Each structure stands twice: as C-alpha cells, then as structure tokens.
Design a protein with these regions (language model features):
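Conserved active-site motif detector
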Residues: 1-101
Length: 101
C-alpha cells in the first residue's frame, strides 16, 4: 500500500524575525491556536524552542496547490504535531513542510 504524505503551506515566515534562521530540513511543531480571534482553525508553527515562525495557510489564495489547508488538516491532527520544512521562500514569506507523525 502506498504511503500517503501530507504537505502543508506555512505562511507569514517573513513576519517573524526568527524565520531568517530557518533551514531546509528543520523540524517544526504545529499547534492548534484555539484562542485565535481571526481564524477558528488556526494552526501556528514553532521551532522546537517554541519560537513562532508562521501559520499553516488557510485561504484559497495562500494554500499552495497540492498542500493541505489548516481547515483540512485541523480535524486530522491532535493539538500538536511535528513537520519537516522541505523548502521555503523567505522573501515571499512561505514554505512547504511535510507532516510527520
């Protein structure tokens, strides 16, 4: 049986200073942000030291084709899950990561 991989778009990488220290292959932690007043399916991305680096994209305008939106991912994960940053474009403010369980 073929393994099904889940990829996500992480946005706002350019909004957090620490994002400039990201590198391909970094392990990130995703947490549901239940108290987010703008998006009730918000999922925030952290480095392992709990430094914020971005959010899982949740808009048709920001989700890269072939990746899961935060809304699609929200009910498939627990409160916290890991991911590996596959590549990113810091100037454009987004990256693609693979969910690891």
């Amino acid at each position: 049986m073929e393994e099904h991989r889940i990829y996500i778009t992480i946005n706002h990488l350019d909004d957090f200073e620490c994002a400039s220290f990201l590198k391909t292959g970094d392990r990130l932690i995703l947490n549901k942000e239940r108290d987010n007043i703008y998006d009730d399916e918000a999922i925030i991305a952290y480095k392992e030291n709990k430094t914020k680096v971005g959010y899982v994209a949740n808009s048709v305008h920001s989700v890269a084709r072939g990746t899961y939106s935060a809304g699609r991912l929200y009910d498939r994960i627990g409160d916290e899950v890991g991911c590996i940053l596959k590549f990113f474009f810091l100037e454009e403010g987004y990256g693609i990561a693979e969910i690891i369980e």
